[in-house]
Swiss-Prot record:
Keyword terms, alphabetized: Metal-binding, Ribonucleoprotein, Ribosomal protein, RNA-binding, rRNA-binding, Zinc
CC cofactor note: Binds 1 zinc ion per subunit.
GO cellular component, one term: ribonucleoprotein complex
One Pfam family linked to the record: Ribosomal_L31
Entry GO MF terms: metal ion binding; rRNA binding; structural constituent of ribosome
Cofactor(s) demanded: Zn(2+)
Organism whose genome encodes this protein: Streptomyces griseus subsp. griseus (strain JCM 4626 / CBS 651.72 / NBRC 13350 / KCC S-0626 / ISP 5235)
Name of this protein: Large ribosomal subunit protein bL31
Higher taxonomy: Bacteria, Bacillati, Actinomycetota, Actinomycetes, Kitasatosporales
Length: 74
């Protein structure tokens, strides 16, 4: 590695809006990062996520008009 071209790599305090915080390393100058969500409050990690099955266009069409694909006469 070349000398004197890389940024300073310092310990950084990451704090979440939920109040959780942890220490990591980063090149941020002031040494603090504020995050909106973290692993303690994100629904995916806490198990409170809601899985929405919206279905596709074909499923919505079949629900509206039924499965009459082969019964149409010409």
């Amino acid at each position: 590695m070349k000398r004197d071209i890389h940024p300073e790599y310092v310990e950084t305090q990451v704090s979440c809006t939920c109040g959780a915080s942890f220490t990591t390393r980063s090149t941020i100058d002031n040494g603090t990062i504020r995050a909106d969500v973290c692993s303690e409050c994100h629904p995916f990690y806490t198990g409170k996520q809601k899985i929405l099955d919206t279905g596709g266009r074909v499923a919505r069409f079949e629900a509206r008009f039924g499965k009459a694909a082969g019964s149409a006469s010409k």
